[in-house]
Amino acid sequence: MLGGTAVVMTVDAYGPISDNAGGISEMSGLGPEVRAITDELDAVGNTTAAIGKGFAIGSATLTVIALFSAFNLEVNHTRIAAGLPEMSLQLTNPNVIVGLLLGSILPFLVGASTMLAVGRAAGAIVEEIGRQFREIPGLMELKADPDPKKIVDIATKSALQEMVFPGIIAVAAPPLVGYLLGPGALAGLLAGSLVVGATMALYMANAGGAWDNAKKFIEKGKLPGHAKGSAVHKAAVVGDMVGDPFKDTSGPGVAILIKVMSVVSLLVASLIALR
């Protein structure tokens, strides 16, 4: 679980650094030539971020496979010690099929909830910014300072509150499925979430970065006949708005989901093995 940490952190660090450099250059009033350079670095950062997330998702997938094997061994050991046959993972077992279906649903549920969470938090921040412009005298004329602490407070509280639902799913789903349907269904849940979650997380990481870079590609004038402000550029901006939470929130969130579910399943394996 920790073997790829150094590589992932090193590759992932490039993107935020280049992105922040662009924001600092814009807020500092530096010339467009500086912003052009930081945009190039930001585009590269999106690519390195996708690569880094690929390492992280691959590491999570291998971890889940190892934990699944440990879960299988623990359940069978407990059942044999109690004089029961080993757990059946045959696809003719209806509980396994139900577990597979439930496991394939959970990554979509968590991905959707995190996407909606980002939208709600962004809406609250935009509303607060509008309130400050309306209520702080001289802010529109740059004669007064805004209140950035309030913005950070909203973002932090939203991040914590909106992660309650995905966290409950990741922790509560394995013991519930195992208790109600037995260890075979829980094994199916893990297998379904692994296959769907790993591919979904990779798709989100790569697609989000591609949509973000597509907007930058158009803004640099590399798509003849479609300058900044055109219909194609507006569509690319929408793609960027979807791509950012895709690659930065939902993709990593799904990878974490399958890993947490596997750990929780291993912890409760001996408790639900006899059901």
UniProtKB/Swiss-Prot annotation:
Its main location: membrane. Keywords: Cell inner membrane, Cell membrane, Ion transport, Magnesium, Membrane, Potassium, Sodium, Sodium transport, Translocase, Transmembrane, Transmembrane helix, Transport. It is found in: Cell inner membrane. Its EC number is 7.2.3.1. The record marks A49 as: Determinant of potassium dependence. Its cofactor is Mg(2+). GO terms for cellular component: plasma membrane. InterPro entries: PPase-energised_H-pump. It comes from the Bacteria. The chain crosses the membrane at residues 51-71, 96-116, 163-182, 189-211, 254-274. GO terms for biological process: sodium ion transport. Requires K(+) for maximal activity. Belongs to the H(+)-translocating pyrophosphatase (TC 3.A.10) family. K(+)-stimulated subfamily. Homodimer. Sodium pump that utilizes the energy of pyrophosphate hydrolysis as the driving force for Na(+) movement across the membrane. This is Putative K(+)-stimulated pyrophosphate-energized sodium pump. The gene is hppA.
